[in-house]
UniProtKB/Swiss-Prot annotation:
This is 1-deoxy-D-xylulose 5-phosphate reductoisomerase. The keyword RNA-binding does not apply. Mn(2+) binds at D150, E152, E221. Catalyzes the NADPH-dependent rearrangement and reduction of 1-deoxy-D-xylulose-5-phosphate (DXP) to 2-C-methyl-D-erythritol 4-phosphate (MEP). Pathway: Isoprenoid biosynthesis; isopentenyl diphosphate biosynthesis via DXP pathway; isopentenyl diphosphate from 1-deoxy-D-xylulose 5-phosphate: step 1/6. HAMAP family: DXP_reductoisom. It comes from Corynebacterium glutamicum (strain ATCC 13032 / DSM 20300 / JCM 1318 / BCRC 11384 / CCUG 27702 / LMG 3730 / NBRC 12168 / NCIMB 10025 / NRRL B-2784 / 534).
Protein backbone atom coordinates (compact mmCIF):
# COMPACT_ATOMS: atom_id res chain seq x y z
CA UNK A 1 0.00 0.00 0.00
CA UNK A 2 1.46 3.38 -1.00
CA UNK A 3 2.06 6.30 1.33
CA UNK A 4 -0.92 8.68 1.46
CA UNK A 5 0.18 12.30 1.22
CA UNK A 6 -1.57 14.96 3.26
CA UNK A 7 -3.16 17.76 1.27
CA UNK A 8 -2.03 21.12 2.71
CA UNK A 9 -3.37 24.64 2.23
CA UNK A 10 -0.89 27.41 3.09
CA UNK A 11 -2.43 30.74 4.12
CA UNK A 12 0.25 33.40 4.34
CA UNK A 13 2.60 31.64 1.92
CA UNK A 14 4.96 34.60 1.43
CA UNK A 15 5.54 35.30 5.13
CA UNK A 16 8.17 33.84 7.44
CA UNK A 17 6.02 30.88 8.58
CA UNK A 18 4.63 30.25 5.10
CA UNK A 19 8.00 30.13 3.35
CA UNK A 20 9.46 27.85 6.03
CA UNK A 21 6.42 25.58 5.75
CA UNK A 22 6.99 25.31 2.01
CA UNK A 23 10.62 24.36 2.72
CA UNK A 24 9.47 21.63 5.13
CA UNK A 25 6.99 20.34 2.55
CA UNK A 26 9.60 20.39 -0.24
CA UNK A 27 11.91 18.30 1.95
CA UNK A 28 9.07 15.83 2.62
CA UNK A 29 7.25 15.60 -0.69
CA UNK A 30 6.38 11.98 0.09
CA UNK A 31 4.32 13.16 3.07
CA UNK A 32 2.73 16.43 1.92
CA UNK A 33 1.15 18.01 -1.15
CA UNK A 34 0.31 21.73 -1.35
CA UNK A 35 -3.16 22.17 -2.87
CA UNK A 36 -3.44 25.95 -2.57
CA UNK A 37 -1.75 29.11 -1.33
CA UNK A 38 -2.99 32.48 -0.09
CA UNK A 39 -1.14 35.72 0.62
CA UNK A 40 -1.77 39.40 1.20
CA UNK A 41 -0.23 40.41 -2.10
CA UNK A 42 2.72 42.58 -1.10
CA UNK A 43 5.08 40.19 -2.95
CA UNK A 44 3.29 39.24 -6.19
CA UNK A 45 6.46 37.92 -7.84
CA UNK A 46 6.98 35.47 -4.98
CA UNK A 47 3.36 34.29 -5.20
CA UNK A 48 3.82 33.69 -8.93
CA UNK A 49 7.03 31.77 -8.34
CA UNK A 50 5.46 29.64 -5.59
CA UNK A 51 2.38 28.82 -7.67
CA UNK A 52 4.48 27.84 -10.68
CA UNK A 53 6.88 25.69 -8.65
CA UNK A 54 3.96 23.94 -6.96
CA UNK A 55 2.09 23.49 -10.24
CA UNK A 56 -1.05 25.15 -8.89
CA UNK A 57 -3.94 26.21 -11.09
CA UNK A 58 -4.87 29.89 -10.90
CA UNK A 59 -8.07 29.16 -8.95
CA UNK A 60 -5.98 27.60 -6.16
CA UNK A 61 -4.18 30.90 -5.53
CA UNK A 62 -5.74 33.63 -3.38
CA UNK A 63 -4.52 37.19 -2.79
CA UNK A 64 -6.21 39.98 -0.84
CA UNK A 65 -4.78 42.91 -2.83
CA UNK A 66 -6.69 43.52 -6.10
CA UNK A 67 -3.77 45.10 -7.97
CA UNK A 68 -1.43 42.26 -7.07
CA UNK A 69 -4.14 39.78 -8.04
CA UNK A 70 -4.33 41.25 -11.55
CA UNK A 71 -0.57 40.87 -12.00
CA UNK A 72 -0.58 37.30 -10.68
CA UNK A 73 -3.62 36.29 -12.76
CA UNK A 74 -1.91 37.49 -15.92
CA UNK A 75 1.27 35.57 -15.12
CA UNK A 76 -0.60 32.36 -14.30
CA UNK A 77 -2.91 32.56 -17.29
CA UNK A 78 -6.13 32.48 -15.32
CA UNK A 79 -8.08 34.44 -12.74
CA UNK A 80 -7.01 33.88 -9.16
CA UNK A 81 -9.21 34.44 -6.09
CA UNK A 82 -8.93 38.04 -4.89
CA UNK A 83 -10.37 40.38 -2.28
CA UNK A 84 -10.44 40.66 1.49
CA UNK A 85 -12.18 37.27 1.78
CA UNK A 86 -9.83 35.54 -0.68
CA UNK A 87 -8.22 33.21 1.87
CA UNK A 88 -11.63 32.26 3.30
CA UNK A 89 -12.97 31.49 -0.19
CA UNK A 90 -9.90 29.37 -0.96
CA UNK A 91 -10.53 27.31 2.18
CA UNK A 92 -14.20 26.87 1.28
CA UNK A 93 -13.47 25.77 -2.29
CA UNK A 94 -10.42 23.54 -1.75
CA UNK A 95 -10.41 20.12 -0.09
CA UNK A 96 -7.49 19.86 2.31
CA UNK A 97 -6.46 17.64 5.20
CA UNK A 98 -4.70 20.49 7.00
CA UNK A 99 -4.89 24.26 6.64
CA UNK A 100 -1.87 26.21 7.88
CA UNK A 101 -3.16 29.65 8.87
CA UNK A 102 -0.09 31.89 8.94
CA UNK A 103 -1.91 35.10 8.02
CA UNK A 104 -1.00 38.21 10.03
CA UNK A 105 -3.43 39.83 12.45
CA UNK A 106 -7.11 39.30 13.17
CA UNK A 107 -7.81 39.29 9.42
CA UNK A 108 -7.14 35.57 9.74
CA UNK A 109 -10.32 35.05 11.78
CA UNK A 110 -12.59 34.35 8.79
CA UNK A 111 -10.17 31.74 7.42
CA UNK A 112 -9.87 30.11 10.85
CA UNK A 113 -13.65 29.77 11.14
CA UNK A 114 -13.93 28.48 7.56
CA UNK A 115 -11.29 25.84 8.27
CA UNK A 116 -13.07 24.63 11.40
CA UNK A 117 -16.34 24.49 9.45
CA UNK A 118 -14.66 22.44 6.69
CA UNK A 119 -13.54 19.77 9.14
CA UNK A 120 -9.87 20.06 8.16
CA UNK A 121 -7.18 20.22 10.81
CA UNK A 122 -6.18 23.81 11.58
CA UNK A 123 -2.42 24.30 12.00
CA UNK A 124 -2.66 27.67 13.70
CA UNK A 125 0.16 30.19 13.51
CA UNK A 126 -2.28 33.12 13.31
CA UNK A 127 -2.71 33.44 17.07
CA UNK A 128 -4.61 36.71 16.67
CA UNK A 129 -7.64 34.93 15.19
CA UNK A 130 -7.88 32.64 18.21
CA UNK A 131 -7.30 35.51 20.64
CA UNK A 132 -9.88 37.72 18.92
CA UNK A 133 -12.40 34.91 18.48
CA UNK A 134 -11.84 33.44 21.93
CA UNK A 135 -14.37 30.91 23.14
CA UNK A 136 -16.50 31.56 20.06
CA UNK A 137 -13.72 29.99 17.95
CA UNK A 138 -12.93 27.13 20.31
CA UNK A 139 -16.64 26.24 20.49
CA UNK A 140 -16.57 25.64 16.72
CA UNK A 141 -13.61 23.23 16.90
CA UNK A 142 -13.80 19.48 17.23
CA UNK A 143 -11.57 17.81 19.81
CA UNK A 144 -7.97 17.96 18.57
CA UNK A 145 -8.86 19.97 15.44
CA UNK A 146 -6.69 23.00 16.34
CA UNK A 147 -2.97 22.25 16.32
CA UNK A 148 -0.67 25.04 17.55
CA UNK A 149 2.24 26.19 15.40
CA UNK A 150 3.69 28.75 17.81
CA UNK A 151 6.85 27.19 19.23
CA UNK A 152 5.66 27.79 22.80
CA UNK A 153 2.26 26.15 22.39
CA UNK A 154 3.72 23.34 20.31
CA UNK A 155 6.12 22.76 23.20
CA UNK A 156 3.23 22.73 25.67
CA UNK A 157 1.36 20.17 23.58
CA UNK A 158 4.46 17.97 23.48
CA UNK A 159 5.09 18.26 27.22
CA UNK A 160 1.45 17.56 28.06
CA UNK A 161 1.84 14.09 26.56
CA UNK A 162 3.89 13.25 29.68
CA UNK A 163 0.88 13.30 31.99
CA UNK A 164 -2.88 13.69 32.29
CA UNK A 165 -4.75 17.00 32.47
CA UNK A 166 -5.46 16.46 36.18
CA UNK A 167 -1.74 16.02 36.83
CA UNK A 168 -0.80 19.49 35.48
CA UNK A 169 0.15 21.94 38.24
CA UNK A 170 1.54 24.87 36.24
CA UNK A 171 2.43 25.86 32.68
CA UNK A 172 5.62 27.86 32.15
CA UNK A 173 5.70 30.06 29.06
CA UNK A 174 9.17 31.28 28.09
CA UNK A 175 10.06 34.61 26.49
CA UNK A 176 13.33 35.77 24.97
CA UNK A 177 12.78 39.19 26.50
CA UNK A 178 13.12 40.85 23.10
CA UNK A 179 15.77 43.37 22.01
CA UNK A 180 15.13 45.68 24.98
CA UNK A 181 15.49 43.18 27.82
CA UNK A 182 16.98 45.00 30.80
CA UNK A 183 15.93 48.44 29.56
CA UNK A 184 13.90 50.81 31.73
CA UNK A 185 10.65 52.33 30.52
CA UNK A 186 12.36 55.73 30.43
CA UNK A 187 15.12 54.47 28.13
CA UNK A 188 12.56 52.92 25.76
CA UNK A 189 11.11 56.34 24.87
CA UNK A 190 14.03 56.66 22.44
CA UNK A 191 13.42 53.32 20.66
CA UNK A 192 13.10 53.57 16.87
CA UNK A 193 11.12 51.26 14.56
CA UNK A 194 14.44 50.01 13.16
CA UNK A 195 15.64 48.99 16.62
CA UNK A 196 12.34 47.27 17.39
CA UNK A 197 12.66 45.24 14.17
CA UNK A 198 15.86 43.50 15.34
CA UNK A 199 15.01 40.40 17.39
CA UNK A 200 17.97 38.78 19.22
CA UNK A 201 17.11 35.12 18.53
CA UNK A 202 14.18 34.76 16.11
CA UNK A 203 13.68 35.72 12.45
CA UNK A 204 10.07 36.89 12.10
CA UNK A 205 7.88 39.31 10.19
CA UNK A 206 7.76 43.01 11.11
CA UNK A 207 4.59 42.93 13.23
CA UNK A 208 5.55 39.78 15.15
CA UNK A 209 9.01 41.21 15.82
CA UNK A 210 7.52 44.45 17.16
CA UNK A 211 5.02 42.52 19.28
CA UNK A 212 7.94 40.54 20.71
CA UNK A 213 9.76 43.77 21.56
CA UNK A 214 6.77 45.09 23.56
CA UNK A 215 6.02 41.60 24.95
CA UNK A 216 2.50 41.97 23.56
CA UNK A 217 3.31 38.77 21.68
CA UNK A 218 3.85 36.98 24.98
CA UNK A 219 0.57 38.41 26.22
CA UNK A 220 -1.20 37.05 23.14
CA UNK A 221 0.45 33.68 23.74
CA UNK A 222 -0.71 33.63 27.36
CA UNK A 223 -4.30 34.26 26.24
CA UNK A 224 -3.90 31.65 23.49
CA UNK A 225 -2.69 29.07 26.01
CA UNK A 226 -5.76 29.58 28.21
CA UNK A 227 -7.97 28.90 25.19
CA UNK A 228 -6.04 26.01 23.62
CA UNK A 229 -5.52 24.10 26.85
CA UNK A 230 -8.60 25.31 28.80
CA UNK A 231 -6.34 26.63 31.55
CA UNK A 232 -6.82 29.44 34.04
CA UNK A 233 -4.50 32.40 33.41
CA UNK A 234 -3.23 32.28 37.00
CA UNK A 235 -1.80 28.80 36.37
CA UNK A 236 0.50 30.13 33.63
CA UNK A 237 3.89 31.56 34.56
CA UNK A 238 5.93 33.67 32.14
CA UNK A 239 9.70 33.63 32.50
CA UNK A 240 12.41 35.33 30.45
CA UNK A 241 14.83 32.86 28.84
CA UNK A 242 17.17 34.87 26.56
CA UNK A 243 18.63 31.84 24.76
CA UNK A 244 15.21 30.75 23.39
CA UNK A 245 16.17 27.07 23.69
CA UNK A 246 13.47 25.93 26.10
CA UNK A 247 10.16 26.88 24.51
CA UNK A 248 7.78 25.94 27.33
CA UNK A 249 7.62 23.74 30.40
CA UNK A 250 4.90 21.86 32.26
CA UNK A 251 5.17 21.27 36.01
CA UNK A 252 3.17 18.29 37.21
CA UNK A 253 1.57 17.66 40.58
CA UNK A 254 4.37 15.31 41.67
CA UNK A 255 6.95 18.11 41.34
CA UNK A 256 8.38 16.99 38.00
CA UNK A 257 8.87 19.60 35.27
CA UNK A 258 9.02 18.52 31.62
CA UNK A 259 10.62 20.96 29.18
CA UNK A 260 10.80 20.98 25.38
CA UNK A 261 14.20 22.16 24.15
CA UNK A 262 15.39 22.77 20.59
CA UNK A 263 17.32 25.45 18.67
CA UNK A 264 15.24 28.58 17.90
CA UNK A 265 13.76 27.59 14.55
CA UNK A 266 10.13 27.36 13.47
CA UNK A 267 10.69 24.37 11.21
CA UNK A 268 10.20 21.83 13.99
CA UNK A 269 6.82 23.14 15.25
CA UNK A 270 5.66 23.69 11.65
CA UNK A 271 6.56 20.12 10.66
CA UNK A 272 4.96 18.71 13.81
CA UNK A 273 1.74 20.65 13.19
CA UNK A 274 1.53 19.50 9.58
CA UNK A 275 1.89 15.81 10.51
CA UNK A 276 0.54 15.85 14.09
CA UNK A 277 0.82 13.74 16.15
CA UNK A 278 3.72 12.24 14.21
CA UNK A 279 7.23 13.65 14.11
CA UNK A 280 8.88 14.51 10.80
CA UNK A 281 12.46 13.11 10.75
CA UNK A 282 15.22 15.73 10.52
CA UNK A 283 12.79 18.65 10.63
CA UNK A 284 15.70 20.67 12.02
CA UNK A 285 19.12 20.00 13.58
CA UNK A 286 19.02 18.89 17.22
CA UNK A 287 20.91 20.44 20.12
CA UNK A 288 24.43 19.17 20.73
CA UNK A 289 24.53 18.29 24.42
CA UNK A 290 28.22 17.37 24.27
CA UNK A 291 28.98 21.09 23.89
CA UNK A 292 28.86 23.61 26.74
CA UNK A 293 25.57 25.49 27.19
CA UNK A 294 24.40 28.16 29.59
CA UNK A 295 20.67 28.69 29.98
CA UNK A 296 19.35 31.58 32.04
CA UNK A 297 15.91 32.36 33.44
CA UNK A 298 14.71 35.61 34.97
CA UNK A 299 11.39 37.24 35.88
CA UNK A 300 9.57 39.61 33.54
CA UNK A 301 10.06 43.29 34.45
CA UNK A 302 6.38 44.20 34.67
CA UNK A 303 7.12 47.90 35.22
CA UNK A 304 9.02 48.14 31.92
CA UNK A 305 6.88 45.57 30.07
CA UNK A 306 3.28 45.71 31.39
CA UNK A 307 1.82 43.83 28.40
CA UNK A 308 1.97 40.39 30.06
CA UNK A 309 0.13 41.38 33.23
CA UNK A 310 -2.39 43.25 31.11
CA UNK A 311 -2.97 40.08 29.08
CA UNK A 312 -3.43 38.05 32.25
CA UNK A 313 -6.21 40.43 33.31
CA UNK A 314 -7.77 40.23 29.83
CA UNK A 315 -7.68 36.42 29.83
CA UNK A 316 -9.62 36.38 33.10
CA UNK A 317 -12.26 38.72 31.68
CA UNK A 318 -12.79 36.37 28.70
CA UNK A 319 -15.54 37.19 26.19
CA UNK A 320 -14.43 39.77 23.61
CA UNK A 321 -11.90 41.46 25.90
CA UNK A 322 -9.00 39.62 24.19
CA UNK A 323 -10.28 40.99 20.86
CA UNK A 324 -9.98 44.50 22.31
CA UNK A 325 -6.40 43.79 23.47
CA UNK A 326 -5.40 42.57 20.02
CA UNK A 327 -7.21 45.20 17.94
CA UNK A 328 -5.97 48.13 20.02
CA UNK A 329 -2.43 46.78 19.77
CA UNK A 330 -2.60 46.39 15.99
CA UNK A 331 -3.56 50.07 15.64
CA UNK A 332 -0.99 51.28 18.18
CA UNK A 333 1.82 49.19 16.70
CA UNK A 334 1.09 50.54 13.22
CA UNK A 335 1.09 54.09 14.62
CA UNK A 336 4.52 53.51 16.17
CA UNK A 337 5.90 52.15 12.90
CA UNK A 338 4.67 55.33 11.18
CA UNK A 339 6.35 57.51 13.81
CA UNK A 340 3.10 58.82 15.29
CA UNK A 341 3.63 57.56 18.85
CA UNK A 342 6.56 56.44 20.99
CA UNK A 343 7.41 52.82 21.81
CA UNK A 344 6.08 52.74 25.42
CA UNK A 345 2.84 54.33 24.24
CA UNK A 346 1.93 51.18 22.27
CA UNK A 347 0.95 49.33 25.44
CA UNK A 348 -0.34 52.56 27.03
CA UNK A 349 -2.90 52.80 24.21
CA UNK A 350 -3.94 49.17 24.70
CA UNK A 351 -4.30 49.71 28.44
CA UNK A 352 -6.43 52.84 28.09
CA UNK A 353 -8.73 51.28 25.49
CA UNK A 354 -9.20 48.26 27.77
CA UNK A 355 -10.12 50.51 30.69
CA UNK A 356 -13.20 51.63 28.77
CA UNK A 357 -13.95 48.23 27.26
CA UNK A 358 -16.79 47.43 29.66
CA UNK A 359 -18.90 49.83 27.58
CA UNK A 360 -18.67 47.70 24.43
CA UNK A 361 -17.02 44.32 25.15
CA UNK A 362 -18.93 41.22 26.21
CA UNK A 363 -19.73 37.64 25.25
CA UNK A 364 -19.75 36.87 21.51
CA UNK A 365 -22.64 34.79 20.21
CA UNK A 366 -21.89 35.56 16.56
CA UNK A 367 -18.82 36.55 14.55
CA UNK A 368 -20.43 39.97 14.04
CA UNK A 369 -20.12 40.57 17.80
CA UNK A 370 -16.36 40.06 17.53
CA UNK A 371 -16.06 42.31 14.49
CA UNK A 372 -18.12 45.05 16.14
CA UNK A 373 -15.98 44.90 19.27
CA UNK A 374 -12.81 45.07 17.19
CA UNK A 375 -14.14 48.02 15.21
CA UNK A 376 -14.97 49.97 18.37
CA UNK A 377 -11.59 49.13 19.91
CA UNK A 378 -9.78 50.32 16.78
CA UNK A 379 -11.80 53.55 16.70
CA UNK A 380 -11.00 54.28 20.35
CA UNK A 381 -7.34 53.40 19.86
CA UNK A 382 -7.04 55.72 16.86
CA UNK A 383 -8.77 58.57 18.70
CA UNK A 384 -6.23 58.20 21.49
CA UNK A 385 -3.35 57.91 19.01
CA UNK A 386 -4.45 61.14 17.33
CA UNK A 387 -4.35 62.94 20.69
CA UNK A 388 -0.94 61.53 21.55
CA UNK A 389 0.48 62.33 18.10
CA UNK A 390 -0.34 66.04 18.43
CA UNK A 391 1.78 66.20 21.60
CA UNK A 392 4.95 64.68 20.11
Amino acid sequence: MGVVTKKILILGSTGSIGTQALDVIADNSDKFEVVGIAAGGSQPDLVISQAQQLGLAADKVAVADAQAAAVISKALGGEIISGTDAAKILVETTKADTVLNALVGSLGLAATLATLESGAHLALANKESLVAGGEFVTSKAKLGQIIPVDSEHSAMAQCLRSGTRDEVARIVLTASGGPFRGWTREKMWEVTPEQAAAHPTWAMGQMNTLNSATLINKGLELIEATLLFETDADLIDVTVHPQSIIHSMITFTDGATIAQASPPSMKLPIALALDWPHRVPKAQPALDFTAAHTWAFEPVDDAAFPAVQLARHVAKQKGTYPAVYNAANEEAAEAFLRGRIKFPQIVDVVDEVLQGASQFAGVASHVDDILATESEARARANALINRLATNL
